Structures are given as C-alpha cells and as structure tokens.
C-alpha cells in the first residue's frame, strides 16, 4: 500500500520514519520530495582503462564539494553520483521507491540508473545516480528538489531488515555519495 501524505506525517510523528533535516513542505500527496546535497562523486576516466565490478577500484571516483552559491555542471552523456540532503531511516514495515522529478526529467536529467529501491531498515543518505541524457549541459544546485521518495506499507515487517547483521548491508549508514561496493558481492578467493 502506497502511503498518503497523512500516513507519511503519522509515521514521522510516531517516530517510525526518520527524515533529517525534516521540512513539512516536502511532503507531497503520496511521496516526500528529496533535495540534493553539495557533494558529488566524479569518475576518474584517466586512472582506469575500464570498470570491473569484481575489483575494489578505490580511485575510480573523486569527491567534489560545491561551494556555497555555486552549481555543478553535468555535461551531456556524463554520469555522476550525488546524495540526498536528507538522511532517511525506514522502519522494518516500510519500503521506499525513489523517483525523479518530472520537471527535471523533461530537461534530460535521470535521477537513478537502477537503484531506486530503498529496503526496510535502511538508514542513511540516499545516493543518487545522475545522468544527463539531454544535448545541453544541466546545472545542478545544492538544495534543489531532485526526486521524490514514495513509501510503501509492507504486508508484514521484514524478518531481516536492511542493516541487520545477516545481510551484510554494505550501504547502511552511508553519508554522501557512496561509490559502488559491488566487489563485495563476489566470493573471496
């Protein structure tokens, strides 16, 4: 069941759903708007000949902090990681789905490549996978609304929520745009 604005407010007021910093004006009829933080991860194209998900390529990305009042220009065909300004904490009975804002999609900005699902139990800042599919550069501004998080009531609470020891939840507690940890999905030799 998709939560309505009143259900979202109830969940926040009850302490089930955590959003920090919280701004009540971000609550929409069936979602919560998310804003972009000031940190971006750009790919170091000159350090690697290719991306190998099986390897820990520590220097694949570099962290860039945008100064106050400045924007970040995302050129056509470019891909960067960013992060929500808000930290989200989901209880074991709620799952989330991140979607882009249609106004930005109409400008050619994609908010996530494949990782739009937020597991119950997740706590942290959501990493955004931003792509410019337009034919002109797009300026990204820290604090701008970049997406919306829809929340779903599960049929029952997760038996093993994200962040519990059994799952090895590699992105639990993440802060800022977090690079891929896909290499942890491969068995050690």
Swiss-Prot record:
<feature type="binding site">
    <location>
        <begin position="101"/>
        <end position="106"/>
    </location>
    <ligand>
        <name>dCTP</name>
    </ligand>
</feature>
<protein>
    <recommendedName>
        <fullName>dCTP deaminase, dUMP-forming</fullName>
        <ecNumber>3.5.4.30</ecNumber>
    </recommendedName>
</protein>
<feature type="binding site">
    <location>
        <position position="174"/>
    </location>
    <ligand>
        <name>dCTP</name>
    </ligand>
</feature>
<feature type="binding site">
    <location>
        <position position="170"/>
    </location>
    <ligand>
        <name>dCTP</name>
    </ligand>
</feature>
<keyword id="KW-0546">Nucleotide metabolism</keyword>
<dbReference type="GO" id="GO:0006229">
    <property type="term" value="P:dUTP biosynthetic process"/>
</dbReference>
<feature type="binding site">
    <location>
        <position position="162"/>
    </location>
    <ligand>
        <name>dCTP</name>
    </ligand>
</feature>
<feature type="site" description="Important for bifunctional activity">
    <location>
        <begin position="116"/>
        <end position="117"/>
    </location>
</feature>
<dbReference type="InterPro" id="IPR033704">
    <property type="entry name" value="dUTPase_trimeric"/>
</dbReference>
<feature type="binding site">
    <location>
        <position position="148"/>
    </location>
    <ligand>
        <name>dCTP</name>
    </ligand>
</feature>
<feature type="binding site">
    <location>
        <position position="119"/>
    </location>
    <ligand>
        <name>dCTP</name>
    </ligand>
</feature>
<comment type="pathway">
    <text>Pyrimidine metabolism; dUMP biosynthesis; dUMP from dCTP: step 1/1.</text>
</comment>
<keyword id="KW-0547">Nucleotide-binding</keyword>
<dbReference type="Pfam" id="PF22769">
    <property type="entry name" value="DCD"/>
</dbReference>
<comment type="function">
    <text>Bifunctional enzyme that catalyzes both the deamination of dCTP to dUTP and the hydrolysis of dUTP to dUMP without releasing the toxic dUTP intermediate.</text>
</comment>
<dbReference type="GO" id="GO:0008829">
    <property type="term" value="F:dCTP deaminase activity"/>
</dbReference>
<comment type="subunit">
    <text>Homotrimer.</text>
</comment>
<feature type="binding site">
    <location>
        <begin position="127"/>
        <end position="129"/>
    </location>
    <ligand>
        <name>dCTP</name>
    </ligand>
</feature>
<dbReference type="InterPro" id="IPR011962">
    <property type="entry name" value="dCTP_deaminase"/>
</dbReference>
<feature type="active site" description="Proton donor/acceptor">
    <location>
        <position position="129"/>
    </location>
</feature>
<dbReference type="GO" id="GO:0015949">
    <property type="term" value="P:nucleobase-containing small molecule interconversion"/>
</dbReference>
<dbReference type="InterPro" id="IPR036157">
    <property type="entry name" value="dUTPase-like_sf"/>
</dbReference>
<comment type="similarity">
    <text>Belongs to the dCTP deaminase family.</text>
</comment>
<dbReference type="GO" id="GO:0033973">
    <property type="term" value="F:dCTP deaminase (dUMP-forming) activity"/>
</dbReference>
<dbReference type="GO" id="GO:0006226">
    <property type="term" value="P:dUMP biosynthetic process"/>
</dbReference>
<keyword id="KW-0378">Hydrolase</keyword>
<feature type="region of interest" description="Disordered">
    <location>
        <begin position="163"/>
        <end position="189"/>
    </location>
</feature>
<dbReference type="GO" id="GO:0000166">
    <property type="term" value="F:nucleotide binding"/>
</dbReference>
């Amino acid at each position: 069941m998709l939560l309505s604005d009143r259900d979202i407010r109830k969940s926040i007021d009850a302490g089930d759903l955590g959003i920090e910093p919280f701004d009540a004006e971000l609550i929409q009829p069936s979602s919560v708007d998310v804003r972009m933080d000031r940190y971006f991860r750009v790919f170091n194209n000159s350090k690697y000949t290719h991306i190998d998900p099986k390897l820990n390529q520590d220097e694949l990305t570099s962290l860039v902090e945008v100064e106050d009042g400045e924007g970040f220009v995302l050129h056509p065909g470019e891909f960067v990681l960013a992060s929500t300004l808000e930290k989200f904490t989901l209880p074991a009975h709620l799952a989330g789905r991140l979607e882009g804002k249609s106004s930005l999609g109409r400008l050619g900005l994609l908010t996530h490549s494949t990782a739009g699902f937020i597991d119950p139990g997740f706590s942290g800042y959501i990493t955004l996978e931003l792509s410019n599919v337009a034919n002109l550069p797009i300026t990204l501004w820290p604090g701008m609304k970049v997406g919306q998080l829809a929340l779903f009531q599960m049929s029952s609470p997760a038996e093993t929520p994200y962040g519990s020891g059994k799952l090895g939840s590699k992105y639990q507690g993440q802060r800022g745009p977090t690079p891929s940890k896909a290499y942890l999905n491969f068995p050690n030799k």
